[in-house]
Amino acid sequence: MSIPAMPFITGPVAEPQEQLRLSPPRGRLSAIIPLSKVQEVLWVDYLRQPWATHYNLTLKVDLTGSNLSLESIMNNIHKLGSRHDMLRTTFHIDSSAQHTSQSYMAVHDAASSFQNIAIVSDDARLQQALRRGLDLSTEFPVQWIVHQAYSVVDGRLVAAHTVYAMGHHIAVDGTSMSHLSRELVQLIQDGDTTTPPPPPPPSYGEFVQRQAAYLRSPEAQDAEAFWLAQIAHTTPHRWTHAAPLPASAPGHDYRKMDTWAFFPSDELAAWSQLYRTSWFRVAVSVIGLVTAGHARPAPHHDSTLQVAFGARAPSFAGCVSHMANTMPIRQPVSSLLRRSGSATFAELVQLVGKNISQAKKNEMYPFLSLVEAAARDGEDTAAASRVAVTLSPRLADDRCTLYPVNGVWDLFFCFLEHADGGVALGVISDPAVFGPAALAALRADVLRTVALSQQTPDFPLTSALSCLADRQVATLAGGPDVEDVDAVIAARVVSDWIRSRAATQPDEIALSNGEDGTSLTYGALDASSDRKAVHLQRLGAGRNDVVVLQLGAVFDMVAWILAVHKAGACFVVLDRQLPLARKQAILRVADAKLFVSDAFDDAYFADCATPPTTVSVWADTAVPADAHLAPVSGAAPTDLAYLVFTSGSTGLPKAIEVEHQNLSSYVSATRAVVPVGRGSRVLQFAPFAFDASVLEWAVTLSYGGTLCFVQHPALLVGDYLADMVDLNQINFFHTTPSVLATIPDGRRLPSLRALSVGGEASSAGLLDKWSRRLHLIHAYGPTETTVICATEHILPASDTLPSPSNIGRANPHVALLICPEDAETVLGPGVTGEICIAGPQVTRGYRGQPALTAAQFRTMEHNGRVTRMYRSGDRGFIGDDGKLHILGRMNNREIKLRGFRMDLAAIEKSILDNCPEVMTASVQVVDDKLVAFACPATLQGDAIRQRIALDLPSYSVPADITAVDSLPLNTNGKVDHKEVLQQFGASTGPAAAIKPVIVTKTAPKKKELQTSDSNLVDRLEASITTLWQKVLGCRDAPGPDVTFYNAGGHSILLSALHKELVTLYPAAKISLLDVFYNPTIRRQAQRLSELVGDDGFIPSSSVSDVSAQDVATPGNSTTATSVAADAPLFAIVGMAGRFPGADSVEAMWELLMAQRDGITTSDGAGAESADLAEGEVFVPRYGSINGLEDFRASDWNMSDEDAQVLDPQKRMFLMIAEEALQDASIPVRTVSGSNIGTFVGIAPNTYLSSALPSSVSSSAFERRYKAVLDPTASTLTAYKLNLLGPSMDVSAACASSLVAVHQALRALRAGDCAAALVGGVSLAYPQLGGYATSDGKIFSARGQCRPLDAAADGSVPADGVAAVVLKPLVAAQTDGDRVYAVIQGHAIGTDGAVDKIGFTVPSSSGQAKVISAAMADARLARHQGVRYVEMHGSGTSIGDALEYKGIERAVAAYEATGGESRCSSGAISPTGTEQQPSDTKQTPRTLFVGSNKGNFGNAEAASGLFSLIKASLAVSRGVVPPLRQLGDCNELMGVAEGSTVQPLRKQLRLEKGDRVGVTALGYGGVNAHCILASLEAVEERE
C-alpha cells in the first residue's frame, strides 16, 4: 500500500521583543495543584523559552461531510472543557518562589470558563495560529482552531470544518490526545441527543499525590538504581557527518516530519513472531544500531535512546493530562562489539528488550528525579540523549491525525498507530544538525536494517552497516590474524599498520592535546612522517642504523618515530632531563648514525667513537614536494626497531635491542589484552624513553584510537592526572600502582573504562578498589620481553579478587616457564623458581654486551619452532589454573620502583666512582624510597647527592644518604646488604609537626612592610624546608637552592608536597604548577609570599595555631596570580542597542548575516553646513541611527526644557540602558535601588557647542558654565534608574566602551557591585548626513568602509548606542539568567612610545601585548582556543595592517612562551608550558579575523560594544558572520595562503570550545581586548 502523507505544521518561532511576565491566576478557581515531576521538566524548559513551540502537539479532526454547524462544533468543544480540569488550567509561579518546584496549576471554575476557539478561513491564518507560543499563565494550555473552508456543491454553498486542538505537552500527552479524539468524535456522533455523560475522570491532583508518595517508597529507590544503571557509562551521539550551515531564509528552524515507512498490521505481527517479542522492541533496536553507526565510534560507552512510556495507571485512562515519561534506554551496541566481533542483532534485541521490560516496571519514576539523582552522583549524561522514540496510541478513526511535539532532540522517531492496526514511521530531525544528505543516508540505513531484521534475526551487527565493520575493539586495518604467528612476525613494521589506518580513516584524530586544543589527524601524521622519512633516507639512514631522537614536541616525536621506521632504521629516545654523563653513556653505547633534536650540545658526543650527524627538527621542510619514500631493501623481521636503555650493574647502561618481529608480535597480541579501537582515547602516560610508551603510541595508533597528551607530563599524579583524564575524555591508560594510589577517591572519571597497572607490586586494596569501578588489567613484563607479556583481567562483575601476586596468563604465542636458577629444566605447577619467558616477544639482547646477553638469554624450542627465552630474575610459580604468580626477585639486586627499573649495584658504583671519600655503600629500599647507607660517618650527604645527580637519572638518586661508621660484611668480606637493611633500614618515623607561618592582615607602615616582607620569605623558607624533610623522609635539610627532584623527590612526592602546602596555607591557593615551576625551597617561599600578598607580614611573636588566623589575601590581585586559583568568569545577560541600519540587537544580527550595508546615503544637503576647506570634499554617507526623537521627557521625570538641554547621547543611552536591564530581567527604577554599577564609554558632547539652542536655558549662569554643569552619562543613568553601584565615564576614543567593560569587570571582581551596566554611545552634532574629508585622511573619500581590503581608503563615521549587562557567571546561573556569552579573559593597555613613529600611529607590539595578556587572563595555554577575532578594523590601510600584524605577533609570542609570565621575584606563575617546535606549528589551526565597520561604519566610542555584541551573538549561535565585502587583501598585511591568521570571507561555524576575541583600539594607542566563550564551553571546561 502507499505510504500515507504525514505533514508537519508546527515549529519554533522567534521570540517577540517583549519579555514574558507570568501573571497570577485570575477569576474563580476550583483547585490549586502543584506540578508533577513529569511536568516540572517541561516547565523549566517553558520558562527558558516561553514563546517556543517545540513542545506543542496538535490533534487534527477532519469533519468534512459531517454537516455540523460551527455552533455545534463550538458547543462540543466547550463540553470537553467543562469535563476535563486540565483544559481549564493555567500555570504559575509565585514571585517569592526560590525554586521551580514551587510552581503550581490553577484549575478554573467550569461554569465561568470558556475554551479559547479561533475561527480561521485561510491557510495563512491557520499556519499562524498553529505556530504561536502560549502564555500559560493567562491562556488555557489547549487552544482550539476551527478551520472553515467553503465550496459550491450543486449550486449550494457548503462549509467543511476541520478542528485542531493545539496543546502544550505540559498539559496533554499522546494518550490524552487519543482520548480527546474519541470523546470529540463521540460527541459529534451523538449530535443533540441527551446521552448521559460518562463519569468524571479522576483529578490530576490525585496523580500528583500518588507520584509524591511513590517517590518516598522502596519501589522508587529500586527504580532509581535501575535508571542510573541505564545511563551509567553512556555517551551522547556525536554524529559523523558535518553539520549543515545555517540557512539564511526565515523559517529555516521549522522542523517537519518525514514519513519513512508504513508497516501493515500483518507485517508487524510477523516481525514480533520472529523475535518472540514486541515489534516495537525490535524497532527500537534497529534505531539504536543505526544511530550508533552514524555516530562517532565510542567503543567504551554505550548510547541511550529516550523512549516514551505511558506511565499511566488504568484508573487514570480518562484523565486528560500529562503523565508520559520519556526515559533513557541503554542501547548496548558498543558493549556487544567490545565482547565479540560476531555479536548478532538477535542478541541486541534480547538485551534491549530486557531493558524495556524492566523500564516498564519502573516507568513511574520521573525523568526529572533521574536527572537530580544523577547530578548527586556527578553523572551528567541523564539529559544528554540526542535521539528519542515514541509510539503514539491509536486515535478515534481515520479522520483524526496527531502531530507530535518537536522536542529538543536531534532525531525523533515517531511510530503512529493507524485505525487499521498499521503503523507509520515518521521522523523529525533538527535541520541545524541533519542536512538533506545526512538524513537520506540515515533513512537508507534504517530501511535496509529493517528489511534485514525481517529476514533473519541472527545477522552480525557489523554486517548491517558498512560504518560498523571496523567498530570492534582491537582490530588491525589490514593486519594479520593474531593466531598466525608467522604472518605476525612477517608483518615486520608496525608503521605499516598505522599507515593503513591513515588510509582508512585519514580525517580522524590520531594525536590530541586537550589543554592547548591541538590535534593531528591520521592523514596529516602519515604525510608528516613520510616527509621526515624521505629526509632520513637522503641522509643515509637505513636498516639497523640507529637514529637518536631528543625532542620536546610530543606530536613531532610520534611523527619522527614513524619516520625512522619508514626509513628502515632503529630509533632510541634520549630523555632531555637526563644528566650529561648519562646522555654521553647512552650515545656511546647506541653508536648512532643520526641525532635528531631541537637543541644540540657537542658535549653529548664526547665519548662517541664516531659522532652522529645532527638533524634539526625543521630539516624536513627542505624535502622536495615530489620526493618519494624509497622502499627499504632487504628488510627483515629481525631488523632492529628501537633501543631501550635501563640501568646496568657495571655502571654502563644496558641497551635492550628490540626487533620489528618483537614489536609486531606484541602489538598484534594486544588484541586479546588491551581494549583499544576506533574512538578510544588513550593517555600517553609514560615518557617516550621508556618501553611502556610503546603500549601507548604503537597500540593506540595501530588500532585506530586517539593518543592524548598533556602539557605537564611530569605532574601526572593525583588531581592533575584525574583532571587530564576528564579533560581529554580518556578511556584507557597504563600506570603504576604508586601513581594510581594518588588519585583521590572522590574523582568519578566517567570516561575511564579500562586501566592497566604494572611496573611494581600492587596492593590487594588498590586492586579491589579499582576493579569495582572498571575493567582492570594487572600487567607484567620485563623490557626484554617487549613491554607486557602476561596479564590478569579483573572485571567489575568478578566474584573474587585475585591475589596481587597473580598476574595472569601469557600473551598469545608467549610461553611462561618456571625454571631452577641457572638451569633450563621446566618445573611443574605450584613449584617456585625463576620466571622465564619464551616466544616472539623476547628481544635480541643487550647491545655491545655479549656476555650479559648470553647469561640472560637462551635459545629453545617452543611450539615446534626455535625461539628465544629470557631469564627474568623474578621469582614465582604457575598455579594449577595456569596463571602466573610473582613473588619478588631472585638473588640479584635489580628492582622496579614507581615503575622505574634500576640496579642497586649500579647506584652504589656511581657513589663509589664519583665520591672518593666514600669507603663503602649500600643502597636499599626503605618505605618505598631509595636510601643509601655509606661510611665513614663524617660524610656529607648533600655533597654526595649533588655529584651522583650528574651521573644518574633523577629517579635513581637516593632520597636520603645516611652516613654510618661501618657497614656489616659477610664471610667473603663483602657488604652484607640484607644485614644492612635489618640494622639501618627501620623507618625514621613521621616528621615533627609543621607549624605554619601565620600572616596577619594588619597593614604596617611602608618601612615596616619592607622589613616584614624579607622576614616573611625567610620564615616561609624555614617552614617549607621542614615540609620537604617530612615529604622526602630525609634527616638532613636540603639546601634552599637544591631542586626538589635533585633532593630525591619525584612526581608522586611533589603531589604530596603540594597537598601539604595547601593544607598549611589554604588561602594562598598555591597550585601544583606553582610548585613544579618553582622547584627549590627559596623559589617556593618567594612564590608563596606573592600569593599571600603585599599586605601581609609576620609579627615578631608568631602564633603557632593555624586556625587562629587566616592567611592574608590581597584585595588588589595582579596578573602574577596562580593559574590554578579559581579565576572568576562573567556572563553577558542583557543587551540592547541602536545601530546604523538596525534598530535592535536582533536586527543587527540579521544585517550582519545578510552582509548588508547599514550606512545611509543622504541627499548631500549637509554640504552647505560642512564649512569645507580647500581640497576637502563632502561625502554624503553616514552611519545614522533611528530613534533620536523617541525620548519623552515625562517618562524620565524631566521637563521639556531639561530634556532639550541634555546631550542627545545621554537621552539615547537612558532608553537603551533601560532596555538592556529589561532584557536581563532586572527590575528598574526600584524604590530601594539596585546594586548595579554603571560604566559608559562616551564621545565628547558636540551638542553643547554646535546644536544647543542658546535660548533654551533662562539662566545666564547655566549658559556660561554649561560645559561644567553637563552631567556625566553614568551618573545621570544611575540617578534616573536608581542604580547604587560605582559609576564611571570613560573617554578613550574608539576603545572607550571596551575599556568600560574592563573597568566594570574589575568592579565586579572586587565585589563593588552585583551587576554592571556598560554602555557605549557616540552621536555627532550637527547631523549633516555625511562628512568632510580629503585624500590621505582617515575617512574614506569614496564613502565605503572596506576593512582589510586592498581597495580600502579609510573609515566612514557613524553614530550608535549600545549597552550590555554583566554579572558574575555563578550569580547568573543561580538566578537562571539567559547567558549570551561568557567573558573569560580581558586586558587593557597603552602603546606608550614603543615601536611608534608618531602619536597617531598604532603599535603592533602594544596591541600584541594586550591580546596576549587577555589570553593569559583567560587561561588559554595556546592561542588555538581562539577561533576568531573581531578586529577594530576601521578600514585604514596602515591601521588595519598594523592591527593584523599585532594579532600575528600575539599569536607567535604566546605560542613561543606558552603563556608563561614571570613574577618580579623570579618565581614563575605558569599559564601554560613552553612549546617546542612541532608539525602543528607548521600547519596550525587557522585564526580568522573580521570587522563590522564595513556594515556600520566607525561608531567610535560605541564601536567596542558593537563588536562585543556581535561576538556574543556569534558564540551563542555558533556561527560568525563574514566581512561584508572583501576583494584582494590589503597588501601591507602580508596575508599568504598558508598564513595562520586569515580574513573571514564566509560564515564560520564555531565548534564547542571555540573562543572569540574582541579588540578595540583608541586614538593615540589605547588597546583593549576581551575573550568570549559560550556557556557550554566553560561548563565543559569546569
From Swiss-Prot:
Q: Which residues form the Carrier domain?
A: 1015-1092
**Phosphoprotein listed as a keyword:** yes
Q: Which InterPro entries match?
A: AA_adenyl_dom, ACP-like_sf, AMP-bd_C_sf, AMP-binding_CS, AMP-dep_synth/lig_dom, ANL_N_sf, CAT-like_dom_sf, Condensatn
Into which family does the record put it? In the N-terminal section; belongs to the NRP synthetase family.
Q: Needs which cofactor?
A: pantetheine 4'-phosphate
Alphabetically, the GO molecular function entries are: 3-oxoacyl-[acyl-carrier-protein] synthase activity; ligase activity; phosphopantetheine binding
Q: What does this protein do?
A: Hybrid PKS-NRPS synthetase that mediates the biosynthesis of the toxin tenuazonic acid (TeA), an inhibitor of protein biosynthesis on ribosomes by suppressing the release of new protein. TAS1 alone is sufficient for TeA synthesis via the condensation of isoleucine (Ile) with acetoacetyl-CoA by the N-terminal NRPS module and subsequent cyclization conducted by the C-terminal KS domain.
- The residues annotated as the active site are C1294, H1432, N1498
Q: Where do the segments described as Disordered lie?
A: 1460-1485
Please state what the annotation says regarding this protein's domains. Answer: TAS1 has the following domain architecture: C-A-T-KS. The N-terminal NRPS module contains the condensation (C), adenylation (A), and thiolation (T) domains and catalyzes the formation of the amide linkage between the isoleucine (Ile) with acetoacetyl-CoA. The PKS portion of TAS1 has only a ketosynthase (KS) domain and this domain is indispensable for TAS1 activity by conducting the final cyclization step for tenuazonic acid release.
Keyword Plastid listed? The answer is no
Note the superkingdom of the native organism.
Answer: Eukaryota
List the keywords (alphabetical): Ligase, Multifunctional enzyme, Phosphopantetheine, Phosphoprotein, Transferase, Virulence
- Per the record, GO CC terms? cytoplasm
Q: Which GO terms describe its biological process?
A: amino acid activation for nonribosomal peptide biosynthetic process; fatty acid biosynthetic process; secondary metabolite biosynthetic process
Instruction: Locate the compositionally biased regions of type Polar residues.
Output: 1462-1485
The organism of origin for this protein: Cordyceps militaris (strain CM01) (Caterpillar fungus)
Q: Which intervals of the chain are annotated as region Adenylation (A) domain?
A: 499-892
The EC number on file is 6.3.2.50
* Reaction catalyzed: acetoacetyl-CoA + L-isoleucine + ATP = tenuazonic acid + AMP + diphosphate + CoA + 2 H(+)
Q: Residue ranges of the Ketosynthase family 3 (KS3) domain? A: 1127-1574
Q: Where is this region: Condensation (C) domain?
A: 33-387
- Top enzyme category: ligase
The encoding gene? TAS1
- Report what the protein is called: Hybrid PKS-NRPS synthetase TAS1
